[in-house]
Design a protein with these regions (language model features):
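Bacterial Sec-dependent N-terminal signal peptides
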Residues: 1-27
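OB-fold and OB-like single-stranded nucleic-acid-recognition modules
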Residues: 17-167
Length: 167
C-alpha cells in the first residue's frame, strides 16, 4: 500500500510539473484577456491624468488605474507602459519578476491595475543607464555617452502592481 501511495504522489507531482506553463509560454500567450495576480473590483478607479495631477496626495497609496497598454517588457513581461486616453500621460506598471508575466499580446489592450503608486527619481547617470537598459531589452545597443536626456527622463511614475485585469 505504501508503494501505491508513493507512486500516486509521484504521479501527481509529475502531472503538476507538466501542466505549469513556462515564463516563455506566458509571455507569448496569444489572448491576453484575463486576471493577473490578485485583482479586486472594489476600489475607485483613477485615470492616469488624475493620478499624476494628484500625485502629492496619492504617492505611496494603494490605487487602481485604468489605461491602454502601450508597451510590454519584451524580456520577461514584468512591466507594462500604460497611457491615458490622451496618449501623453504614462505610467509604468511593474511587478516582481516572475510573479506575474504580462503577455506581449497585451499591447493595445485596456487594463485596470492596482498597487502602490510611486515616483522613481533618477540622477543623470541613472537616467542614461535606464534608457540603455530599456533599449537592450529590445535588442538595441546604445552608448550612454550619446544619450540626450529630456526633463521627463529623470523620473518615472510607477504602479508597483499586485494584480491587473486586461480586457
Amino acid at each position: 500500500m505504501n508503494k501505491q501511495m508513493l507512486l500516486l504522489i509521484l504521479l501527481c507531482i509529475c502531472i503538476g510539473c507538466i501542466s505549469n506553463k513556462s515564463e516563455s509560454d506566458l509571455l507569448n500567450k496569444k489572448n491576453p484577456i484575463g486576471i493577473y495576480g490578485n485583482f479586486s473590483s472594489t476600489e475607485k478607479i483613477q485615470n492616469i491624468v488624475d493620478l499624476i495631477s494628484n500625485k502629492d496626495v496619492l504617492i505611496n497609496k494603494e490605487v487602481k488605474v485604468r489605461g491602454l497598454v502601450n508597451e510590454v517588457c519584451p524580456m520577461r513581461g514584468c512591466w507594462l507602459e500604460v497611457v491615458d486616453e490622451n496618449g501623453i500621460d504614462k505610467l509604468r506598471i511593474k511587478v516582481t519578476d516572475g510573479d506575474i508575466v504580462f503577455p506581449l499580446s497585451a499591447k493595445g489592450r485596456n487594463i485596470e491595475a492596482e498597487g502602490q503608486f510611486s515616483i522613481l527619481t533618477l540622477n543623470k547617470q541613472q537616467a542614461k543607464n535606464w534608457k540603455k537598459h530599456l533599449a537592450a531589452e529590445k535588442g538595441i545597443e546604445i552608448d550612454t555617452s550619446e544619450i540626450i536626456l529630456s526633463q521627463n527622463d529623470y523620473f518615472e511614475y510607477r504602479l508597483n502592481t499586485t494584480g491587473a485585469k486586461i480586457f
